[in-house]
C-alpha cells in the first residue's frame, strides 16, 4: 500500500484570496495547450497569427469551463443544484464533466470557425492533440482534491484517501492521468506526424477517450448521488462514453472513405 501525499488543496493564499490547486491545474492545462498550439500553428494555417490563436484558445477555454460545469450539473447532480443554485459557482470544490466540457468546446469551435472561415472539423483536428494536456492536469487536480477515487483494493499501489474511508483504494485519478493524459497525448501526437483526412484526428480522439474512460470506470467509485445505473456496474460515465466510441468509429470510417473518394492530384 502506498501513502497518499497530504497536499493542501490551496496552492497559494494571500489574505482572503485563495488559489486552489484544482483551478491552477486548469490554468496549466490551458497554458500548456497554447504553447504547443503555437508550435503547430503555421503547419495548420501559415496565415494565422498568435493573436488569432489566443482568441481560439480563449473561447475553447470558456467552452471547457462553462460546458464542464453545466454538464456536471445536468448529468450528475441536478437535484442538488436546483435546491441550491449558488453551488454552481463553487468550481474550486470540483464537479466538472468532461462530456459537458466537450459539448462546450464543440459549440465554441463551431462559432469560431464561422467567424474565421474554418470548418468545424479542421479546427477540432487542430485542437484534439492538445486536449490531453488539460485532461492530465485536471486528473492531478482531482488527486490533490482527494476526489474521484477508486474502489477498495489490495493492489500494492492502493492508497487510503482522506475522504475515502479507512480502506485502501485504487488511485483511479492517476489511472485516468496515465490514459487520458499521457497515453492519449502520445497516440494523437504520433498519429498527426503526417497529414490525415479531415475529421480522422477528431474521430481517433473521441474513440480513444471513450475506451479509456469506460475501462477506468470499472475501478472508479461512481458519484454517490447516482451510484450504479444498471447491473451493479454501469455508471453514468460509461453511458456517456458509449456514444463517444460509436461516434469515433463512424468519424474515422467517414473521414477515410471521403478522402479515398476525392480525386488525387496527378
Swiss-Prot record:
Membrane topology, as annotated: Multi-pass membrane protein
Subcellular location: Cell inner membrane
Pathway: Protein modification; lipoprotein biosynthesis (diacylglyceryl transfer)
Residues reported in the UniProt entry to bind a 1,2-diacyl-sn-glycero-3-phospho-(1'-sn-glycerol): 139
Keyword Acetylation: no
Principal place of residence: membrane
Residue spans crossing the bilayer: 17-37, 56-76, 92-112, 120-140, 171-191, 199-219, 233-253
Tagged with keyword rRNA processing: no
Protein origin, superkingdom: Bacteria
GO CC field: plasma membrane
Its EC number(s): 2.5.1.145
Keywords: Cell inner membrane, Cell membrane, Membrane, Transferase, Transmembrane, Transmembrane helix
A GO molecular function held by the record: phosphatidylglycerol-prolipoprotein diacylglyceryl transferase activity
Xref: PANTHER family: PHOSPHATIDYLGLYCEROL--PROLIPOPROTEIN DIACYLGLYCERYL TRANSFERASE, PROLIPOPROTEIN DIACYLGLYCERYL TRANSFERASE
Function: Catalyzes the transfer of the diacylglyceryl group from phosphatidylglycerol to the sulfhydryl group of the N-terminal cysteine of a prolipoprotein, the first step in the formation of mature lipoproteins.
Family under the similarity heading: Belongs to the Lgt family.
Name used for this protein in its record: Phosphatidylglycerol--prolipoprotein diacylglyceryl transferase
Organism: Pseudomonas aeruginosa (strain UCBPP-PA14)
Amino acid at each position: 500500500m502506498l501513502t497518499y501525499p497530504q497536499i493542501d488543496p490551496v496552492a497559494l493564499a494571500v489574505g482572503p484570496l485563495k488559489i486552489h490547486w484544482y483551478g491552477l491545474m486548469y490554468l496549466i492545462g490551458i497554458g500548456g495547450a497554447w504553447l504547443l498550439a503555437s508550435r503547430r500553428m503555421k503547419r495548420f494555417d501559415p496565415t494565422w497569427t498568435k493573436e488569432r490563436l489566443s482568441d481560439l484558445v480563449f473561447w475553447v477555454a470558456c467552452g471547457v469551463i462553462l460546458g464542464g460545469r453545466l454538464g456536471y450539473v445536468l448529468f450528475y447532480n441536478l437535484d442538488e443544484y436546483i435546491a441550491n443554485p449558488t453551488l454552481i459557482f463553487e468550481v474550486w470544490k470540483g464537479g466538472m464533466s468532461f462530456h459537458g466540457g466537450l459539448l462546450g468546446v464543440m459549440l465554441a469551435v463551431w462559432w469560431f470557425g464561422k467567424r474565421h472561415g474554418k470548418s468545424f472539423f479542421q479546427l477540432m483536428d487542430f485542437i484534439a492533440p492538445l486536449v490531453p494536456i488539460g485532461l492530465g492536469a485536471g486528473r492531478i487536480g482531482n488527486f490533490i482534491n482527494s476526489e474521484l477515487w477508486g474502489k477498495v483494493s489490495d493492489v500494492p499501489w492502493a492508497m487510503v484517501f482522506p475522504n475515502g474511508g479507512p480502506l485502501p483504494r485504487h488511485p483511479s485519478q492517476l489511472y485516468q492521468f496515465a490514459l487520458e493524459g499521457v497515453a492519449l497525448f502520445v497516440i494523437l501526437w504520433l498519429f498527426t506526424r503526417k497529414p490525415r483526412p479531415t475529421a480522422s484526428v477528431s474521430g481517433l480522439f473521441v474513440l480513444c477517450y471513450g475506451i479509456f474512460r469506460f475501462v477506468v470506470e470499472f475501478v472508479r467509485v461512481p458519484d454517490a448521488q447516482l451510484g450504479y445505473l444498471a447491473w451493479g456496474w454501469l455508471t453514468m460515465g460509461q453511458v456517456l462514453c458509449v456514444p463517444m466510441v460509436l461516434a469515433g468509429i463512424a468519424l474515422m470510417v467517414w473521414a477515410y472513405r471521403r478522402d479515398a473518394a476525392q480525386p488525387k492530384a496527378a
